[in-house]
Amino acid sequence: MIQAFDGKWSRFRSDSLVSECSHSVNDIPLDRDEYDMLQLYEQLHAASEGAITPLIGQVLEDMGYDTHYSLRPKDYIQTASDWQAQLTLHADRLEFKAPALIDIGAAGKGLLVDRIATLLKKDAPEYSIDAGGDIFVGGAAERIGLEHPQDQTRAIGVATLQDQALCGSSSNRRAWSDTLHHIVDARTNTPVSHVVASWAVASSAMRADMASTALFFLSPRIVESIIQKCESIVMYDDGKLQYAVSKEIELYV
């Protein structure tokens, strides 16, 4: 399952379908959950006025977050292609109108976590999955600390999860200089600087993963209007928090 997903969606593999679509006009066939993921991308792309897009792939490559992890930005960084000019989303496929490199890092790992959770649920009454910060807890409840983005020995709070996912994003986790990290505004080709971390809880890891990225660009209110039944927390560069959470999330503020 993991190999098949990676072979389809990873832009870090030269033999993946995503890499193939960066060199030749092609379609990517979609399962229902993949279509749902790209629908959310499309809605958030519109809400963010183009800041959020899977077409950020070439921008990240040019910035140094590339296949070889060179972490050396090129002298010229391409701008992200226009969604309407480049892609058409159908229920069964993603149509490319011209070659382009996409990156589904905002939600792809979460989607894979959901698929693994579905597999485990068949035989395990209780289980938990931690895929580098994309967490799903099934069965019995678990308390998960929300790591402070500037001090790994501290937590800003605790979330109690039961048949839910928690995903966090932080600008310091995949950063390769004082100014470059992996959460980039496609309109300006610059990493987001006013938000340092976000967390989201949702019924699926894909939705929580997508929400945690979207919170770097949109307010919790807007994100929750698109990704419903989602709880969110944002920490800004001045240390202030904005949040909309239930009693299952305890914040130390």
Label the predicted regions.
Residues M1-V253:
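Mature catalytic core of soluble alpha/beta enzymes
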